[in-house]
Amino acid sequence: MTSLRIHTIDQLLETLDQLVEKSERGDRSHPSAAGFWTELLTKPGHPLSTQLPDEPLVDWHERGLLGTLDGARVLDIGCGGGRNSRWFAEQGAVVEGIDLAAPLLDAVRPTLPDTVTLTALDVLRDPLPAGPFDVVYDSGCFHHLAPHRRITYVERVLPTVRPGGRFGIVTFAADRVDSPTDLQIVSTGDTAGGMTFSLEDLRTIFTPLKPLDLRPVNPNREHTFAPDFLNTALFTSP
């Protein structure tokens, strides 16, 4: 039986998904990667096993760029062990944390405040928690998506930000970490453990939003998670 030729955008995206799934590293944005992320995020000594909040969050909050967090609704994308979800809750926010790593979420759920709800889901394919949200934050999920799925991410995630709300993101920095080009990734299916983005990349990808802050993460801020190989950006929704 001859399969139908590609004739829709969804079919094209799904075909490209198959290329990524066939690579040795696999598709780390797919639910099948739950075990990988659970092991990585609980590995003793791994930088991501920290309980510290991201440096940009603390900085933006002190500068008043996040708005009032007391009573705010927050969506924490790729929440992992819940360190940023916990920080938001400590500021008075009601938090929806989402991540692929169901075993990890089951382990950390009892340790988090009651105002944090954790849900295991695929940000690209599963229904997202009902918005709108005052703050949507992504610490390291976006840079693991295959290039063609950035389109899906933008179409699904940005509408969850309320008008006047905030969207914040942290990614690998293009000038600090090596990564393949999008063409190389699409050709080989290998996402190489994550992709890098320049500040201009972030500005362009999230064009529907208004930028408030684009900069490298400040590695000198104490009591925060602040590796020197990350870029960060904060936007507001019109």
Mark where each language-model region is.
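Class I (Rossmann-like) S-adenosyl-L-methionine-dependent methyltransferase catalytic domain
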Residues: 2-128, 145-156, 166-238
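A short acidic, Gly/Pro-enriched loop at the edge of an enzyme's catalytic core
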Residues: 128-136
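Short beta-strands and strand-loop turn motifs
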Residues: 138-139, 170
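Short catalytic micro-motifs in class I SAM-dependent methyltransferases
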Residues: 140-144
